[in-house]
Structures are given as structure tokens and as C-alpha cells.
Amino acid sequence: MKKNIFADTVLKGLSLKKKKLPSWLIYDSKGSEIFTQITKLENYYPARCELEIFNTHKSTLSKLFSSTPTQLIELGSGDGKKTMALIRQLIEEGVKFQYTPIDISKGAIDNLVKILNQNFESSSLNITGLVADYFEGLASITENNKLRKMVLFLGVTLNNMDIPDAKSFLKRLHQLLQKEDYLLIGFDLMKNPKLLNQAYNNELFEKFNLHLLDRINECLQANFNKNLFVQQAHFNPQSRAVESFLYSTCKQTIQINSLNTNIKFAEWETLQTEQSFKYSIEDIENLACESGFKITENFYDSKRYFVDSLWQVIK
């Protein structure tokens, strides 16, 4: 990641009257490791629900590859568990396909390629990891490439975007894809707010959010003291989003040497660090239509907590 982007984002967010920083700032190797631990918690359902979806519907998904040669592209590499279920199904059915995961982290790509090669070493799996920004990577793949594409955008990454940002993201994807290409995209559905509060309030989520302060200290020579902040997430019924905050437990001034600035916190002043919007099916239908896609099928887990929605490009 370019340092100036990190620095500019931090300065802009901490200068707001209501301080707010995007959650992508948390993700370095340690931040990713903490989040992987979160996905294994009993109360944190999205990863478990999505793995169930892939195990239940992998045969249906594999049929999309049988009619024409297809390139499987994944935005964000993750740990490969969900994708592995689909890849195994495709290999067992003798389907020919190319798999290209795209991630800005070289370590994440190298780790995923290693895991998949170990699991499918006796197969003819054609995998090429790409270290790049999503759009730069997708543009390099689609240029002069007429293979049909199946793009996977799994997990809750889109849920973490503001609705206008989500629309902008999807419209950019649409521009890079060809008519009748597929997009399989994960959505966390609206549910009992008590379940949401349980999912986002625990020691690991606090550790994850506080790691943001470590990153600012490390990258920008700041002096945040994590012991002077506590984390709490709340469901906001107006925005239909779980919003996570760090609360300053005292009046304090933070020095950020690389930015040549001081940031003041009042006692119990908040810094918003995360947001995760919860969707209805109607929301998803509208989002697909406004972004240039049509929904061909929705795949749910047994509790209907989560949906992987299969979209096709309209042009």
C-alpha cells in the first residue's frame, strides 16, 4: 500500500468533527490474522454461513462452467476454504477452468497458492495468483481475453462500504466485464439485532479494532496508547448497519509526527472504525439493477442469515 494513501486517509478521517476511519486501514498481516481468528468464533456467523452455502450448492455452481470455458477470478484471496469446495467439485467433474485470485497482499496470494497446490497437487489445477488492486488486476485479465468470467466477491467486504461506494464499486466491475459474465457476491442479510450485537462485540473484535492504533503508530510515528481506548459496536436501525467505535477513556492529545499534527480527543469521544450494512433481498435486487446486472439465482444458508447472490452482466 502506498504510504501517502494511508497517511492522507488517516489525516482526513481524524480531522472530521465526528472522527471516522475505514476498516481497510486495519489490515496488515497481523490485522488479517486477527480477523481470521474472528471468523472462527461461534457468534461470528458470516464465514460459517458462506462455507455452508458453498458446500450445499457447489454442484449447481459447477454447472455454470460446463457449457463454455470459464475463468474463475476471486477478488480477495482469504483462506481459500470456500473456494476450495467449488474447485474440488469442478476438478471431480473434469471441468476445464483457470483460477486467478487477486489480492493487494503478496503474502496472502502466496499463502493461498501454496494451500491450493498442496490440496490439489495431483490434479491439473491451473492457478495464477495476481498481486494487484482489484480493478487493475481485473483489467489486465480481461484485456484481449474472451473467456467467460466468473468473478467471486465473497465475505462481507461489500457490506463494509457505504451504499454509494458499493454502487460505484459494482459499476466499475460492470465496465470491466463482458456481456453474460457472472459475479457471485456475498451479502450479510438483516436479522435480529441481538444476533448482530453478539457477533460484533467480543475480545477479538476489540483487539482487531485497537490494532488500527498500532498501525497508525507504526506507519505514521504516532503515540496512541491502546490502554486508553475501549471498543464497542452498536446496531444503527436508521442506517441498518453495525457501527464499531473506539471510545477515548480520557481527555488526551495524540501526536502524529509523520503528519506534523496533533489530534485531540475529549473524554469518551468516539472514533468510528467499522461499519457493516445489512441488506434485504429488495436492497440486493435494486443494487444489481442499478449496477448493470441481473440476478439469476440466490444461494442461502439454512438459517437465511447470508446470501451469495449470482449476478449476470447485462450490456
Located regions from the model:
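Substrate-binding/catalytic lobe of Class I Rossmann-like enzymes that use SAM or dcSAM, i.e.
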Residues: 197-277, 281, 285-291
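Conserved beta-strand signature within the Rossmann-like core of class I S-adenosyl-L-methionine
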Residues: 176-192
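Conserved SAM-binding loop of SAM-dependent methyltransferases across substrates and taxa
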Residues: 79-94
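Conserved SAM-binding strand-loop segment of SAM-dependent methyltransferases
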Residues: 122-136
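A short glycine-rich, Lys/Arg-flanked "PGG" loop and its adjoining helix->strand segment in the class I
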Residues: 167-179
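Conserved class I S-adenosyl-L-methionine
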Residues: 68-78
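Class I SAM-dependent methyltransferase Rossmann-like catalytic core
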Residues: 18-64
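Conserved SAM/SAH-binding beta-strand->alpha-helix loop
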Residues: 103-107
